[in-house]
């Protein structure tokens, strides 16, 4: 039985009645060959799962998609792929871990290739990057025309692994196969933008908006792309267009708030964040928005109010069991803490949030990715404060992590920390090589520019500073490192250096 195709790019879900059987045995050969099978005993579960993918992946209604996945596993508690999808997409660490475990518990109910998809979803969250890529490659080889699979794969490669060229190649190939598969158009624009080719994204956004004029996400994505390009008025226009189409499209509401924050209108940003917080029922999302709300006080150089706000949000995150968010809060406070010893204490608190007594709520991948960011910040702060023992100890911890965890966040954090240590030791050439391995992180870019300056690479240092200054996103590292870069460039423009430069 096929679920309703709400959009022309929907994958076909195959279900069984009574005893579970492999989906490919219950479906026509053409369907089985074109898309990864989906096995469930419940028509209600199958329809809810399909609607979860429609809302979460295709229309980008995140909260609604999660709710459909929850309905799917409620209708069929042994629906392995349903559990895997809920665990994969959930921002609640406990829910993600619990659902991942249930997916493995019932994985025998799934078809063999469906099991590969479950393993890919789980492995991405468990820090098993090599295994995840292996499963993904097998699936892409077996299902070259499964559009949603290819789109999800490319999204993960670009957004989580920094494998931009690989993700772009998958999407370009997919759009040649079906130029009207608009989720791929959307993701290709993001891949270009994240890969430093944002100028290639607006034409794709024009296609996306024209193709789906009554959907809010095309306007929302266009808004985010323009924000990444630093065109804040255009970003606000597109976000507001999305809200005119659907006032409940909360991603655009938080987009408006973050755009005001980046423009420096923190009072208006805080008011808009509060609207966004009220617009979601997901507790983890509410806390994420509260973190952005608290960050506005740091942006306007009110550190006391910022710390008070973050401590209040930390209490809420702790009560909700959101350990990753707790760690992120302490990491933010550390970066903006002018006292190095106190900042390192903040990072000790962040590590404690992820400690053995608390990590039971976390999947290993979530824990190690956040821990890598904490240790990277620790190395950065220690080097800037001249605390070499702390810097060396931190670099060693990351080196040990990097030997067993091949995820991009862990690997990049290690190279960044090693680069910071080499910089402190006066090995500027070595520092440059290591810091260039982490080209998207504002902390690494800040130190890379300094290392290039020390090495006499003045033109390269300025180019790196310009790259850093142009970053326009919501990360705490950007809020910390990008404004000084912009000030430095502004100072250079008004006080040009006399004489030549390389």
Show which residues each predicted segment covers.
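Canonical tetratricopeptide repeat
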Residues: 85, 152-153, 187, 221, ...
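Structural marker of alpha-solenoid helical repeat scaffolds
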Residues: 75, 106-109, 142-143, 176-178, ...
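Residue-level recognition of tetratricopeptide repeat
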Residues: 44, 78-79, 146-147, 181, ...
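Alpha-helical segment of the N-proximal tetratricopeptide repeat
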Residues: 41-71, 75, 115-134, 152, ...
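Position-specific recognition of the canonical hydrophobic site in helix A of tetratricopeptide repeat
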Residues: 56-57, 91, 124, 158-159, ...
């Amino acid at each position: 039985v096929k679920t309703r195709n709400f959009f022309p790019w929907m994958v076909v879900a195959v279900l069984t009645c009574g005893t579970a059987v492999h989906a490919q045995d219950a479906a026509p050969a053409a369907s089985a060959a074109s898309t990864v099978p989906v096995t469930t005993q419940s028509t209600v579960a199958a329809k809810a799962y399909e609607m979860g993918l429609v809302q979460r992946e295709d229309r980008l209604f995140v909260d609604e998609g999660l709710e459909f996945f929850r309905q799917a596993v409620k209708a069929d508690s042994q629906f392995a792929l349903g559990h895997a999808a809920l665990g994969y997409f959930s921002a609640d660490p406990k829910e993600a871990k619990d659902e991942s475990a249930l997916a493995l518990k019932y994985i025998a109910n799934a078809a063999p290739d469906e099991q590969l998809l479950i393993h890919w979803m789980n492995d991405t969250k468990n820090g098993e990057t090599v295994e995840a890529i292996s499963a993904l490659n097998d699936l892409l080889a077996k299902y070259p025309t499964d559009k949603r699979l290819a789109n999800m794969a490319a999204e993960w490669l670009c957004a989580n692994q920094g494998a931009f060229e690989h993700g772009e190649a998958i999407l370009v190939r997919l759009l040649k196969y079906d130029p009207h598969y608009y989720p791929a158009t959307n993701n290709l624009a993001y891949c270009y933008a994240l890969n430093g080719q944002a100028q290639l994204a607006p034409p794709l956004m024009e296609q996306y908006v024209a193709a789906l004029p009554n959907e809010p996400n095309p306007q929302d994505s266009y808004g985010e792309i323009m924000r990444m390009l630093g065109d804040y008025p255009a970003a606000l226009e597109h976000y507001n267009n999305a809200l005119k189409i659907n006032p409940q499209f909360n991603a655009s509401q938080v987009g408006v708030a973050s755009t005001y924050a980046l423009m420096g209108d923190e009072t208006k940003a805080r008011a808009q964040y509060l609207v966004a917080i009220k617009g979601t029922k997901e507790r983890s999302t509410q806390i994420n928005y509260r973190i952005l709300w608290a960050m506005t006080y740091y942006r306007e150089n009110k550190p006391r109010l910022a710390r008070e706000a973050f401590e209040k949000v930390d209490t809420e995150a702790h009560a909700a069991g959101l350990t990753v968010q707790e760690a992120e809060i302490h990491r933010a406070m550390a970066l903006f803490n002018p006292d190095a010893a106190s900042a390192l204490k903040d990072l000790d608190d962040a590590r404690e949030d992820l400690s053995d007594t608390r990590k039971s709520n976390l999947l290993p991948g979530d824990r190690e990715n956040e821990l890598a960011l904490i240790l990277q910040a620790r190395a950065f702060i220690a080097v800037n404060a001249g605390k070499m023992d702390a810097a060396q100890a931190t670099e060693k911890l990351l080196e040990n992590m990097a030997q067993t965890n091949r995820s991009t966040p862990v690997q990049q954090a290690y190279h960044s920390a090693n680069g910071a240590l080499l910089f402190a030791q006066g090995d500027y050439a070595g520092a440059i090589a290591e810091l260039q391995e982490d080209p998207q992180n504002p902390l690494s870019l800040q130190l890379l520019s300094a290392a290039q300056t020390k090495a006499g690479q003045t033109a390269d240092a300025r180019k790196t500073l310009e790259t850093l200054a142009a970053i326009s996103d919501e990360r705490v590292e950007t809020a910390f490192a990008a404004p000084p870069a912009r000030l430095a460039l502004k100072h250079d423009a008004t006080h040009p250096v006399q004489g030549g430069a390389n």
